[in-house]
From Swiss-Prot:
It is an enzyme of class 2 (transferase). Residues 570-629 form the KH domain. This is Polyribonucleotide nucleotidyltransferase. It holds the Pfam family RNase_PH_C. The keyword Secreted does not apply. It comes from the Bacteria. One of its GO terms (cellular component) is cytosol. The keyword Transferase applies. It comes from Chlorobium phaeobacteroides (strain BS1). PROSITE patterns: KH_TYPE_1, S1. Mg(2+) binds at residues 503, 509. Residues 639-713 form the S1 motif domain. The gene is pnp.
Amino acid sequence: MFIRKEIDLGDGKVITIETGKMAKQADGATIVRMGDTMVIATVVSSRTPPSPNQDFFPMQVEYREKYYAAGKFPGGFIKRESRPSEKEILSARLIDRALRPLFPNGYYQDTQIIISVISSDQLNDADVLGGIAASAAIMVSDIPFANSMSEVRVGRINGEFVINPTINELAQSDIDISIGGTNDTICMLEGEMNEISEAEMLEAIRFGHEAIKKICSLQDDIAAEVNKPKRSFLAIDAPDELKESIKEACEAPLKELAYMPLAKEERAEKTTAVYKSITEQILGRYKNEITAEDIAADPSKALYLNEQIISGHIHAIEKQVMRHMILDDAKRLDGRKLEEVRPISIELGLIPRAHGSALFTRGETQALVVLTLGTKKDAQMIDTLLDDTEKRFMLHYNFPPFSVGETGRVGGVGRREIGHGNLAERAVKKVVPSESEFPYTIRLVSEILESNGSSSMASVCGATLAAMDGGVPLTKPVSGIAMGLIKEDDNYAVLSDILGNEDHLGDMDFKVAGTRDGITACQMDIKIDGLDYHILEKALEQSKNGRLHILDKMTESIADPRGEIGQYAPKLSTIQVPVDAIGMIIGKGGETIRSITEETGAQINVDDDGTVTISSPNGESAAAAIETIKTLISKPEVGTIYMGKVKDIREDLGAFVEILPRTDGLVHISEIARERVNKVSDHLKQGDRVKVKLIDIRKDQRSGKIRYALSIKALLDMPAESANGPSAQEEQNQ
């Protein structure tokens, strides 16, 4: 059955959803279109029952942008799409985080969602369309799913909110936030903004939610027409008798443990001991009661002897105990109050050869952030469907297994690391100076050395501090905090600066970063259905208090960026030259620019608009290169002294010397030395570098060419201080 429906979101933004034409062997498939951007999403969920020991939902979301969608060839030697780009990974995470909470508890079938961008108008980003398509594909399938989910992007231009702004509109927008939600609630947020207030954030979310409701209704209509019954599944759960036995055995020791304000490692050891003791106790009891014949007669009896089932219910009791402690007693695992931030310590300049560094420690979460400054040549080339750009500010996040006291694979960057690094990067980039103010390429690397919650927000704080330590003139410092939520019916508690356990056992992870004047980035994941706006409002207000507290601690360490960049950072200078002089600076085959680099030790980059950036290890090298370039592009003037190169010898006439690229002059035989010169080659050889003075400029009457008369003798007649004065020194630097 082919179905196509559309909805107009205003401003000519029409979204079309269709199903029944393509990929019909998948459990569900849809195509979503806006403008000329189209995505196809498919979903397949295994019908093989999961293992009785499985306690997680193995869902995989793949988002791929096909280069043919924009009529482009993939870059590089191999002309086909290969591993996912950072943009594709971030888009996949965006969709995964919005969909995952909507699958029913206990549904553990292997599920794969593949979203492919098959057409791109290079105006509309396809990531939010991919979220809509994925949800719609599940809705028209027989896979159990709570309700439809839609994603939109919200921008704001001149104070007016815009749904799904184009790339051109986003360039003018002070908000770029992706929102995922259902008819009733918001389940995912991620975005960046130019220091907006908490009230403005809520307003943007409400605006986006209205559009989400319309798109969800469209999905519901399509699903109703398809009318495919949802498959049944058996959620593996402990029998009631077993649950009661486990609760009786473990509730008291877990409650006693919860009220102990312990460090992470000690709590983990004691918790493991409780799990082991209770599991052995339960197994010992039922091994004596249940025989092989009992299991043959009633296979569910095997669950009483399943360590995974027992451990899973102990975990459920642990979660319940912690949540009640917070809701009933306003007490947290480490003894803090609900709004209290963990102790903070900061050290700057720890890495002697780095261009800037900071060690930011908050409780048991620690980030070492290191700054590297480079030239424009160090910028990251970005090749996507939408555009080809250069990225001059990067923040990379590394999460080694030792940071949580574990062993693990060390190698390529994982999706989580890419996602956390991107969030921290978006938070800080709003205060990074423009290229005209600070022409460096900036790379910050956050090494997570310890982790017990909110390592991405520790990276935001550490990155700000490392940049300021390295003399990067950030407009304002940025801090970040992770908020949590515990909610049971109408009773709830919002937690500031959550621990790893509070994130794992809680209902929300809401990261907010910003300056004193407003929010610069946020990310929210919800594990429950039904987040009320008044809870969101409280979380935002509480996050502001925590953010300002952390900023106070940061400014105690360093209030303003250092006045100079790090000792070992390259020194950059820029000059502007006429566009028609670019060729003169570069020279034939790059000969001139290479020569300047060899002689001065400076690296030179020339942009198409005539901006010349000089990078050098010291100021003297840069100054020499600048003076050389200025001389190269200047017009020859009588009296100017040049360091030239002998190009040709005429024994009875003199020597032709190149004083500027493609500009030669004649040193007449009479201007070579004070004494009489009989043979030019006795004094000069081809290729010699000699200092000459321009003594005359005239136009040849017959050819019309400009002739330059040069003299070596004129410099010999000059006093030493004149011959080595500013103009002569200028040429020595060439």
